[in-house]
Amino acid sequence: MKRLIFAAVITSFLFASLAQAAESFEATACRSGTATMVQASKELLVMGFELKGMLQSNTEMLNHASEVCVGTIKRIGEETIQMGFCKYLYPNGDINVVEWDGARNGGNWKYLLGTGKWENIKGGGTWQMIKRAKPIVEGTFQNCIDLKGSYELPK
């Protein structure tokens, strides 16, 4: 009986050590973008866009990442739906890729891929528009979003 209890405790310990606890974080991404209009009318707006910027985070592991995002927006009346993908490049060359969706000013995101320290990453969270700035150059737009979420990495 003692062996059985000992084996159960050891097994639990081994499985617990294989998975790292989820790390929560907050970050801000500020970026500039360009859009390609597909349809622009009172009834329907459809466009694609590309954003380039930088991520700043309260977690050093996520801080100072370069960002590129592509996405689409569809607006029918007052309803806005957007979706896309972002790639983050860290100072050491590692990357991660996320998928996101949402309404006009916020939504959800999740990790799809990671390399190096991000290999086999899992997690996701929410994004929220915090600021839109007046375009610095005609044909561009600038904004900042807040990201909140968590990630898990295997040990």
Enumerate the predicted regions with their spans.
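Sec/Tat signal peptide C-region and signal peptidase I cleavage site
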Residues: 15-21
